[in-house]
Amino acid sequence: MLETITAVNQAVNSFIWGIPAMVCIIGVGLLLSVRTGFLQLRKFPYAIKTTIGRIFRKKDASDGAMTPFQAVCTALAATVGTGNIAGVAGAIAIGGPGAVFWMWCSALLGMCTKFSEVTLAVHFREQNKNGELVGGPMYYIKNGLGSRWQFLAVLYSLFGVLTVFGTGNATQVNTIVTAIDSALLAYGSSLNSILPTVNLVVGVVVAMMVAMVLLGGVKRIGSVTEKLVPFMALFYVVLALGVVVINYRRFPAVLASIVGGAFDPRAFTGGAIGSIFLSMQKGVSRGIFSNEAGLGTGSIAHACADTRKPVKQGMFGIFEVFADTIVICTLTAMVILCSGVPVGYGSAAGAELTISGFTATYGGWSSIFTAVALCSFAFSTIIGWGLYGSRCIEFLFHTDKVVGPFLVVYSFVSILGATVDLGLLWSIADTFNGLMSIPNLMALLLLSGTVAKLTKEFFAGEGAGK
């Protein structure tokens, strides 16, 4: 029975996270780009001006809401995770340096996809009985497509709830304990005997911290993420830029390998990778599944923003993809390629390859800093996905009374993630994560006209100037 479940899950997982999903996500992104006149390119300066340009402006949100900046920080908290460190390394190892080029290409379309998701989420959101703003794919399906499409909203929420415990929590906690264990073992193998106890303590501490943040509601979530996300992003960017600066002589050759390797991977991998398609597949998939454009999850956080202008909040969606993929994922690639560490093209690789890039440049002591970065990324992901799960279960049961018990269970899973190996369950959760894209992409396809209309009205009226 267990073997059958494993086989079925692997088959579905390969399909959902494989070529069909990429084609659908890219296709919808291209359609949305055409219908908005490639807004992500035409209005990119405006997007930066209305996002980064307003970060330091103090603004208080109304009760039950976040400021627009808190909303994007919460979305980034869930998006910028360990995949930015481990996933990029895997893409380069299997797809070669050229995978980075295709990652950039997918991000350009992903910007418009996420812009559309955020715009629709704010436009079709509701206010629950506690006065909190709630929205996301399930709400723009319900309010934008009508009752006959309600089943898609239910499916999205169901897949979301089934995803959060594994993808959003347990795998992230496992990354935290792995990073801490590695840092401890760097000081001597004699510490190996205390690792089980350390893992349990870490799991309990993480569970308590997660519960304290999530049970405080959207105001506390926003307050935490607006402080944590900029810190962890800046910390990682500075650390990675240092690697590039120290190894600046390698930068021109690295850039050439990224562009050239996209079209002739064999020439830059010693013949280990000879397929342009493989390079494209790995780069595009990393871009898509790093910034989550097409999954719709980030729009759940953006729907909490205290704003009356859906399109203006949508600009944060463009910024989010830019920050996640163009900045952070690219810097991870530069750490690996500029440091000169052996990549081992054609073989699987993960966070250890990125860590090797840092240690090759800074020395062994940098393992402490990479552990801090990994822990920060993982913890922020747990917080972001906790919000997503609470919104999904609230939609399924039509009441917020289930949210509290759900968050208690969600927090407890952190202990299991730190101490127990439940690989199959987390693999199934990863499959459900991919399944979330199906109802969301269908909704984006059917509501593409609404996105185009809202965008045109916004930039034609006074809204764009305010």
Regions found by a protein language model. Give the residues of each.
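N-terminal alpha-helical transmembrane segments of multi-pass membrane transport
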Residues: 1-82, 92-99, 110, 411, ...
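Transmembrane helix-loop junctions in multi-pass membrane proteins
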Residues: 4-5, 35-40, 83-88, 166-176, ...
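Membrane-interface loop-to-helix entry segments
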Residues: 24-32, 36-48, 173-180, 197-247, ...
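Helix-loop-helix module between adjacent transmembrane segments
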Residues: 31-33, 106-131, 138, 142-174, ...
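Flexible loop linkers connecting adjacent transmembrane helices
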Residues: 38-66, 90-100, 104, 112-147, ...
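Alpha-helical membrane segments and immediately flanking helix-loop junctions
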Residues: 59-94, 120-144, 155-161, 273-322
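Selective recognition of specific alpha-helical transmembrane segments in multi-pass small-molecule
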Residues: 109-117, 203-218, 229-249, 285-286, ...
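Extracellular/periplasmic helix-exit of transmembrane alpha-helices
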Residues: 117-129, 241-257, 265-271, 304-307, ...
